[in-house]
């Protein structure tokens, strides 16, 4: 792992001999989570057994798991095993906990898969099941204080608490909704139920405590800021109609950089103050 100083272009080697997979840094930069993969059983002979509809796709029998690499001593520790792949969702701000998910097929009922979400104590490896075989579940990320999770899911998730489609029996599953769950009480709040655009979370900012979303807003992709304190959304006044990338300082949300296009330019980078 090499660090590059953009101002001076000086390079510094931080780590050597780490596992040759992609990885995620812990918030304190004292360990990495990486993703070892195991290949599935190979079929021999002229006939091939189709285990499930997804088994028709090449390489779907392979499984990916999670492992922890300790930077101080170079020791790797396997964290997950099993018949289903496991996916890292987030690491708590203090680096003590990890959220991961699994998914399995469910060919008899929409959306034809079931997802589970787990919280792991990285010191004791104790596992707390947050959701088991939940339909329509998406991703999860920690709040800055580690006491809540920001969830994304279909309006149909969690018993349909995010549905806002009148008398229509089926909500639009492509209309991604955002929810906040309190880890102490397990109460879930559908924060985008009355917000029209489809959302994709960018960051729950430490500086102002607000959540920033990229949205599909009609013909545009706009950036909105949500205040959990006031339960309100605010559209950022940007120079672009379609914002393809947006990033802001973790502790100073007054400074951001973004890339996008409008009716008179394309692929332009801006600073937002």
Language model regions located:
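Hydrophobic beta-strand positions that form the internal "hydrophobic ladder"
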Residues: 29-32, 98, 146-149, 210-211, ...
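Conserved beta-strand position repeated across blades of beta-propeller domains
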Residues: 24, 90, 141, 203-205, ...
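Short loop/turn segments that connect beta-strands within beta-propeller blades
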Residues: 5-9, 70-74, 121-125, 182-186, ...
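Residue-level detector of Asp-centered blade-edge/turn motifs that repeat once per structural unit
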Residues: 27-28, 93-94, 144-145, 206-207, ...
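Serine-hydrolase catalytic core recognition
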Residues: 208, 245-273
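A flexible loop/linker signature enriched in serine peptidases of the S9 family
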Residues: 1-2, 16-21, 35-65, 80-86, ...
């Amino acid at each position: 792992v090499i660090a590059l100083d953009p101002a001076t272009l000086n390079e510094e080697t931080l780590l050597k001999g780490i596992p040759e997979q992609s990885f995620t840094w812990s918030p304190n930069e004292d360990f990495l989570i990486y993703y070892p993969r195991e290949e599935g059983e190979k079929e021999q002979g002229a006939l091939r057994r189709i285990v499930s509809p997804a088994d028709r796709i090449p390489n779907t029998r392979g499984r990916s798991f999670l492992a922890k690499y300790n930077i101080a001593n170079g020791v790797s520790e396997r964290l997950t095993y099993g018949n289903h792949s496991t996916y890292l969702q987030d690491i708590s701000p203090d680096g003590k906990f990890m959220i991961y998910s699994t998914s399995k097929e469910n060919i008899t009922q929409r959306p034809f898969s079931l997802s589970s979400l787990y919280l792991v104590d990285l010191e004791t490896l104790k596992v707390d099941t947050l959701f088991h075989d939940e339909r329509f579940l998406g991703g999860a990320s920690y709040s800055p204080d580690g006491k809540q999770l920001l969830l994304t899911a279909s309006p149909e998730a969690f018993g349909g608490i995010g549905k806002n489609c009148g008398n229509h029996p089926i909500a639009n599953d492509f209309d991604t909704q955002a929810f906040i769950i309190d880890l102490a009480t397990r109460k879930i709040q559908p924060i985008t139920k009355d917000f029209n655009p489809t959302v994709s979370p960018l960051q729950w900012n430490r500086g102002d405590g607000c959540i920033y979303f990229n949205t599909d807003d009609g013909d545009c992709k706009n950036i909105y800021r949500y205040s959990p304190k006031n339960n309100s959304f605010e559209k950022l006044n940007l120079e672009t109609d379609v914002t393809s990338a947006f990033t802001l300082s973790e502790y100073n949300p007054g400074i951001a950089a973004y890339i996008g296009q409008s009716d008179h330019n394309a692929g332009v980078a801006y600073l937002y103050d």
